[in-house]
Amino acid sequence: MKVKLVLAGVVIATALTTIACSVRPASTDEALINPDMGWCFYKYSNRAWAYGINTPTEDTLDWFPGCSTMYMRLTWNDLEPEEGDLRWEIFDTYAQPWIAKGKKVAIRVMTCSQVEEGTPEFVRMAGAKGHWFTYPKKTSGLDFPPRWEPVYDDPIFLAKFENFLKAMAARYDGDPNVAFIDIGSLGIYGEGNPRPDYPLSDEERAEQGGRNPDCYPPAWKTRLSKLHIDLWRRHFPRTQLICLDGFDGGWNPEPDGEMMRYCRANGIGFRDDSIFTFPPPEKNKFRPYDSWCHDNWARLFAPTQPVVVETCHYPYRARTGQWDNEKYLKCVEKYQASYLSIHDFPKEHLESCRATIDKINKRLGYRFELREVTYPDTVKTGEKVEIVSTWVNVGVAWQVKGAALAWSLVDAKGNVAWTMVDNRFDFKTLDPTLDDVERPQTVKTPCRFGFTKKVSEPDNVVVWAREAGRKFPDTVVMLKPGAYTLCVSVGSRQGTPAIALPLEGQVGQTRRYAVGRIEIQP
């Protein structure tokens, strides 16, 4: 470990001279795998083959820097082709290797797609209302067959879909291996936008008044959005849900949306799909930036909820000239993204965009740098001391779930001998670095290393143990005197490390990082 020791001062404490050592650890450039952030590998992207068909089941993309999550987006029809015949193994088989590595999975279930049927046939046969649409050839250049879109508030459709959600929730709600679930039951691809020829009542048509519902959501669209948001909220109260901007109009020019406010109030995160898909800005007055629309909405979510960004399908847009690697990084900055898609075959994407991916990994999500730590080099057992550390979040996002700072003493064998957790400081308060402005925080952690106590007497158990020939000292010493490595970690309130830091000196694979040495004296 490369550390720089600086003599910072001398403190006299109860007949023991303590030297305060200051260390400024060097930060590394490594890509980190951390909770609630990272790259998403698309095992399924509306299609069973895209983009995991060439990736073996056991391949968890450890070679793709920063890839933390496997994303699976399939139709309801894939998962329940016949009523009650639930094909969860389509998810679970591929999830297992990722879970075994400590990585996560994410899910979206769609009810409408132009590629194949989204809603199972048994729903239509039961009498659910809907309409057939043909995806326009001018959009894709292909002749798609007609597909069926449900009427999203039809009672039969809702009853059948809610039965499916109950079964899905029984399996996945509250599962710590699930990073997030998209609310994906409204609109084509689950993006919240019903087709332009979606059947409306006379009253709903009057509400719309000739306006584009993708720009200015009428009352019927808002009602459907809230209906489906609440449907998922009801069944997944213990899961991080994500809502797409299209639920409030994918081209809505307003600074905020009614459904976006509703989602923030109910702990639902934000997602924007298909960055780089759109025409240049001079052809669309509603988009404030070159290649996306709602980074302003994303920034309203970022302080408290995760933001997920999906790019367009890279192979096509790279050919049409709409892909821009500089904007690839810029969209992460503008959206303050926690998650970013690999919307391509991952190996080829890494080869094509490696330099930009490396830059993104230094900014995506949160990234905690320890800039300086000051600690006493010698401490008496149980003595009150203070460790002062300065931290900077050099990422673009907050660590919204919260995390605690811990200082541990590790012995020569690599065993954790003592751990102190700072219960006053929470890393979710560490603001990200935006527009090159760092917001460091200095944390003063009160510590006591070790605990010594005389064995209480009289005590029947003590008498019985000694009469039986058991030998033990008169004093309980919970931390033996001697030299220890001082390690820092970020994780649970109990001191369990959870977050990787860009530091050298990790003790094994524990996510504890050595910063110096402390001598414990009796």
Residue ranges, per PLM feature:
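Bacterial N-terminal signal peptides that target proteins for export
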Residues: 1-8
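Bacterial Sec-dependent signal peptides at the C-terminal "C-region" and cleavage site
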Residues: 12, 16-28
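N-terminal substrate-binding region of glycoside hydrolase catalytic domains
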Residues: 24-157, 299-324, 329-333, 337-351
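Well-ordered, non-membrane alpha-helical segments in soluble/globular domains
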Residues: 54-57, 84-94, 158-167, 216-230, ...
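An active-site-proximal structural segment forming one wall of the substrate-binding cleft
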Residues: 94-99, 136-182, 224-231
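Substrate-binding cleft/loops of secretory-pathway carbohydrate-active enzymes
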Residues: 185-202, 212-237, 242-301
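Substrate-binding cleft of secreted/luminal carbohydrate-active enzymes
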Residues: 246-249, 258-371
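Extracellular/luminal regions of secreted and cell-surface proteins that mediate adhesion/ECM remodeling
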Residues: 358-522
